[in-house]
């Protein structure tokens, strides 16, 4: 199968490393110098250092050529840019005829749209889906066992994703609920910032467990309000991705929270991180979308208040703990 991966960041490179030995894979990098260096050195030193690229993996900085590569023989295009680049890439690929998958997790800044909503607007006739789940790029690239979910309303496209991505180290499940899969992938980044803050403040494992559990309740409330299935949030893209991102130190969003708890400013944290932490950019959008739907998301609101400087981490914690006691469940709490 011909597969094009658009975006030579950590995730795009990691997925390419996994599929290139089995499929005709072309990895596109926006920067020509970066593409040439990666192809010559067989190492993406900036985003995935120390991982050798397979000889079969080719690189290009020519976007038109990258798209054309997947047009033949019913190929696939995987968009591995940050959420901010999804609209542009979908528009460029809309007429290709290839199946389109994206890896980014978040709500689009400005519009508040999820990936499938962006696709409906700019590529309404395309076959599209989202590939998500608990997955650190470095572990995927190393061939460590990972499970993902391929979500699309197109059954044939879901089956094609299994053929393309499933391997001895990467297990791919399918879902017909892209809304739920996208909400889980987007909001868990915000909850991971909250758990990072709590851990950075030394609040203990009880507090971490409470934030993860009540964070899952927030994710579920928002998702079902948007039309998702409840059981989706008990799966890989919900509970699975939340647990990994909230507790694993390879998580960029968790690292943001840990550093904020140490008193560093957000600009300092982001400069030191050097990579995109989607939760920082989508938190306010998540909250705005929830408020428009009348969905209560107190943990998300606390994270937004810390990110924009209205509350310190300690003040945000105090506000959460002083909330009126309620019954547990998915009703507003």
UniProtKB/Swiss-Prot annotation:
NCBIfam families: PRK00094.1-2 (NF000940), PRK00094.1-4 (NF000942). Sn-glycerol 3-phosphate binds at residues 105, 133, 135, 188, 241, 251-253. GO terms for biological process: carbohydrate metabolic process; glycerol-3-phosphate biosynthetic process; glycerol-3-phosphate catabolic process; glycerophospholipid metabolic process; phospholipid biosynthetic process. Its EC number is 1.1.1.94. PANTHER family: GLYCEROL-3-PHOSPHATE DEHYDROGENASE, GLYCEROL-3-PHOSPHATE DEHYDROGENASE [NAD(+)] 2, CHLOROPLASTIC. SUPFAM superfamilies: 6-phosphogluconate dehydrogenase C-terminal domain-like, NAD(P)-binding Rossmann-fold domains. This is Glycerol-3-phosphate dehydrogenase [NAD(P)+]. The active site is at residue 188. It holds the Pfam family NAD_Gly3P_dh_N. Keywords: Cytoplasm, Lipid biosynthesis, Lipid metabolism, NAD, NADP, Nucleotide-binding, Oxidoreductase, Phospholipid biosynthesis, Phospholipid metabolism. GO terms for molecular function: glycerol-3-phosphate dehydrogenase [NAD(P)+] activity; NAD binding. The keyword NAD applies. Gene3D superfamilies: N-(1-d-carboxylethyl)-l-norvaline Dehydrogenase, domain 2, NAD(P)-binding Rossmann-like Domain. NADPH binds at residues 11, 30, 105, 137, 252, 276, 278. Its main location: cytoplasm. It is found in: Cytoplasm. Belongs to the NAD-dependent glycerol-3-phosphate dehydrogenase family. GO terms for cellular component: cytosol. It catalyses: sn-glycerol 3-phosphate + NAD(+) = dihydroxyacetone phosphate + NADH + H(+); sn-glycerol 3-phosphate + NADP(+) = dihydroxyacetone phosphate + NADPH + H(+). HAMAP family: NAD_Glyc3P_dehydrog. Catalyzes the reduction of the glycolytic intermediate dihydroxyacetone phosphate (DHAP) to sn-glycerol 3-phosphate (G3P), the key precursor for phospholipid synthesis. Pathway: Membrane lipid metabolism; glycerophospholipid metabolism.
């Amino acid at each position: 199968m011909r597969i094009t991966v658009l975006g030579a960041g950590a995730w795009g490179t990691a997925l390419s490393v996994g599929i290139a030995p089995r499929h005709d894979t072309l990895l596109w990098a926006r920067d020509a110098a970066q593409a040439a260096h990666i192809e010559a050195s067989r190492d993406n030193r900036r985003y995935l250092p120390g991982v050798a690229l397979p000889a079969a993996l080719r690189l290009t900085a020519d976007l038109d050529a990258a798209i054309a590569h997947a047009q033949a023989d019913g190929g696939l295009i995987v968009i591995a840019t940050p959420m901010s680049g999804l609209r542009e890439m979908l528009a460029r690929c809309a007429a290709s005829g290839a199946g389109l998958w994206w890896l980014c997790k978040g709500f689009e800044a400005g519009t508040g749209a999820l990936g499938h909503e962006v696709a409906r607007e700019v590529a309404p006739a395309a076959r599209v889906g989202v590939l998500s789940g608990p997955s650190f790029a470095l572990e995927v690239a190393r061939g460590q066992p990972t499970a993902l979910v391929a979500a699309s309303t197109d059954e044939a496209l879901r089956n094609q994703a299994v053929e393309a991505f499933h391997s001895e180290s990467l297990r791919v499940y399918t879902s017909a609920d892209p809304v739920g899969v996208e909400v889980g992938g987007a909001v868990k980044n915000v909850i991971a910032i909250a758990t990072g803050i709590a851990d950075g403040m030394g609040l203990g494992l009880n507090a971490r467990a409470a934030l993860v559990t009540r964070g899952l309740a927030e994710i579920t409330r928002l998702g079902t309000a948007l039309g998702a299935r409840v059981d989706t949030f008990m799966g890989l893209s919900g509970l699975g991705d939340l647990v990994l991102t909230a507790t694993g130190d390879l998580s960029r969003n968790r690292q943001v929270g840990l550093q904020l708890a140490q008193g560093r400013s957000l600009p300092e944290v982001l400069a030191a991180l050097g990579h995109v932490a989607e939760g920082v950019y989508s938190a306010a959008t998540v909250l705005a979308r929830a408020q428009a739907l009348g969905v209560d998301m107190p943990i998300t609101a606390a994270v937004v208040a810390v990110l924009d400087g209205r509350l310190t981490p300690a003040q945000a914690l105090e506000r959460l703990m002083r909330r009126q006691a309620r019954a547990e469940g998915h009703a507003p709490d």
